[in-house]
Swiss-Prot record:
UniProt subcellular location: Cytoplasm
N6-acetyllysine sites (modified residues): 180
Enzyme class: hydrolase
Name of the protein in its database record: 6-phosphogluconolactonase
Keyword terms of this UniProt record: Acetylation, Cytoplasm, Hydrolase, Phosphoprotein
Residues the record lists as Phosphoserine modifications: 49
Residues with the N-acetylalanine modification: 2
Amino acid sequence: MAAPAPGLISVFSSPQELGASLAQLVAQRAASCLEGNRGRFALGLSGGSLVSMLARDLPAATAPAGPASFARWTLGFCDERLVPFDHAESTYGLYRTHLLSKLPIPDSQVLTIDPALPVEDAAEDYARKLRQAFQGDTVPVFDLLILGVGPDGHTCSLFPGHPLLQEREKIVAPIGDSPKPPPQRVTLTLPVLNAAQSVIFVATGEGKAAVLKRILEDQESALPAAMVQPRTGALCWFLDEAAARLLSVPFEKHSTL
């Protein structure tokens, strides 16, 4: 079987330049979608360093569109830890504090888990919310998913060798044995990731260099992040120089200096 295509690789001189370009891309994608046939923009976010990156740059990047445009945004989360929203590990909680307070997206269009439910019920509840928001789609089709990648090659809460990598029926799955704490999580599955119109992986720092070489150069297709191959959508990688330092495959170098 042929190795999967790695997608377009863009390398930036610093995380700050990466973040500014990422925010502009999100704003451009939103504007394009709002002008298109569907008339809405569905964005899926991941946690980690992306929270501070988007909180710093996205409000200014989206400001020219005006506050009324956010009424047609739908925001979901690619995975979530089963913790209260005020917990330091809550992805939604961090975005609520640092980003959503600056963007007038209606609360009803921000799709979250119910952390009070058992993990299996929380996954089913989140799947129901997604199906309601994406009526007409057999599998929810996000306009843009922003994903991270761990040093082990995991993305969302899909970990190497885990049975969830074989899930084909559920759009959202519970995980009760995450090798990375906290152990109970809810995650989008590969069918949803691969149905997206656009997927951007974001990785910064030397700690990601080795796994990025495995994915993008050695093409280790069994790693979860390498299994994200949108069927009809675009796949891009946004890296800083430290994360890209081991790559010899072609990439686009960007700098605003």
